[in-house]
Structure formats: structure tokens, C-alpha cells
């Protein structure tokens, strides 16, 4: 794992500042726009279904409404498109770093657009769906932590916890999904860099990950835990700083 981490750093250090800047700009622009789109879509679907808000009683009927299905389809399409473009941009950045090229965030974005165009010409429509599934598995802890804070998802998860059979089934399904995804983790490399079609990219990924599955899984798990710990630390520090600022300005106001 140490060698894999070192090799990865050797590749990205050529452009790590621009990769970080690209991620900050890309996520900073696309995330608020996408969240607003999803929020408006849900409000429109609620209005069309005749509801003011979601409850455990009306969520079933709400989900089968045609407008709801259309809103979810649009949100899924836009989300997959945003995710695919980001992935293509990062592949461009790593590919450029391997050839010792300095790439600006604009070059990374343009390279991502070019790779997206190539995938469309090859009709690799399975690749964006694969990327979405991979993204959901990797970010599942963050997604669940966000969803359970809102109604009626919190009620649904509370009821789900009371069903051990359902929980066991979901855990088995998750483990199966992760194990199935590991041998296919380098499919993007085969499609976007080696210019293969999706099925050939999957085969190429199997070849490259052969006898390295557990090493790749351990490396991915290590960095996932590192990101979670870093995000938690940043959150705690932010809360502490905010609390100190509130106390300070409150005392200043009282003193006046």
C-alpha cells in the first residue's frame, strides 16, 4: 500500500495545486446549482402531487407520481453528467501529470469535455452509469449522514432499524456491490485513456487488478477513512471557531 500511495503521489504532485483548485472551483459552482435544481424539482413535484411537505403517510403516493419520476430522472441525468465531467477532468489531470505536463484548471476542464465527447462518439453510455454507482458506493457514509437529517428520511431509517432482516439484506447487498466494484475500478482508465469500449474497459480492468484486489481495496479504504477523519476535524474546528466568534461578538455588543 505504501508503494501504491507513493506512486500515486509521484503522478499527481506535478499538478496537485491545479487539481485542488479545479476541484474547489468545480464543486463550488456545480454543487449549489445542482442542489438548487433538486430542491426546485422536489417543490414542483410536491405542488403537482397536491402536498405541502413529505410525511411517512404520503411519501409512497408521492414517489409514484409522473411529475416526481420526471423530476428524479432530470436530477439523476444532470448529476451523472456533472460527475462524469468531473471524472473526465481528473483523468485528464492525472494523464497530464504522468507526462510531466502543467495543466491549469481550464485545461483540465477542456480535457474533460474532450474525453466526454470521445465517450459519446464511442457510445459508452454504460460508463456514466458505472461512475454514478461507483460514486454512490464511495460516498455512501456522507450521503446517508446527510439524508437522515431530513424528514421523512429519518422516520424511514428509524423504522428500517427495527427490521433486522431488511438491515441484514442491505448490508449483504452493499458488501456484494463493493466486491463487484473492485475488479472494475479501473474501467475508466481503459475507456478514457486506452480508448476502449465499455466492455473491453471492464476486461482490461480485470486484467490490471488481478491479484491486487485486496491491495487496491485497502488503499481505497485507507484514504476514505482519512478523508472522513479530515472532514470531521475540519467540522469540529469550524464549530469551535464559530462558537468563539459568537461569544466574542456577543460580549462586545453587551459591553456597548
Predicted regions and their residues:
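Hydrophobic alpha-helical membrane segments
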Residues: 1-256
Amino acid at each position: 500500500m505504501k508503494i501504491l500511495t507513493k506512486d500515486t503521489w509521484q503522478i499527481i504532485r506535478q499538478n496537485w495545486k491545479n487539481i485542488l483548485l479545479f476541484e474547489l472551483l468545480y464543486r463550488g459552482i456545480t454543487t449549489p446549482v445542482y442542489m438548487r435544481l433538486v430542491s426546485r424539482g422536489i417543490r414542483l413535484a410536491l405542488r403537482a402531487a397536491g402536498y405541502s411537505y413529505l410525511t411517512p403517510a404520503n411519501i409512497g403516493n408521492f414517489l409514484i407520481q409522473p411529475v416526481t419520476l420526471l423530476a428524479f430522472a432530470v436530477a439523476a441525468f444532470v448529476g451523472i453528467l456533472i460527475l462524469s465531467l468531473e471524472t473526465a477532468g481528473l483523468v485528464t489531470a492525472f494523464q497530464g501529470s504522468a507526462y510531466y505536463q502543467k495543466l491549469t484548471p481550464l485545461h483540465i476542464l477542456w480535457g474533460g469535455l474532450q474525453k466526454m465527447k470521445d465517450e459519446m462518439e464511442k457510445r459508452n453510455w454504460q460508463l456514466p452509469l458505472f461512475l454514478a454507482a461507483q460514486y454512490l458506493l464511495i460516498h455512501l457514509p456522507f450521503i446517508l449522514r446527510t439524508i437522515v437529517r431530513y424528514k421523512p428520511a429519518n422516520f424511514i431509517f428509524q423504522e428500517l432499524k427495527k427490521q433486522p432482516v431488511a438491515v441484514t439484506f442491505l448490508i449483504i447487498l452493499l458488501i456484494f456491490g463493493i466486491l463487484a466494484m473492485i475488479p472494475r475500478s479501473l474501467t475508466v482508465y481503459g475507456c478514457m485513456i486506452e480508448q476502449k469500449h465499455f466492455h473491453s474497459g471492464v476486461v482490461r480492468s480485470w486484467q490490471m487488478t488481478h491479484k491486487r484486489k485486496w491491495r487496491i481495496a485497502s488503499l481505497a479504504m485507507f484514504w476514505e477513512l482519512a478523508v472522513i477523519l479530515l472532514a470531521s476535524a475540519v467540522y469540529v474546528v469550524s464549530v469551535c471557531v464559530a462558537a468563539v466568534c459568537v461569544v466574542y461578538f456577543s460580549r462586545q455588543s453587551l459591553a456597548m
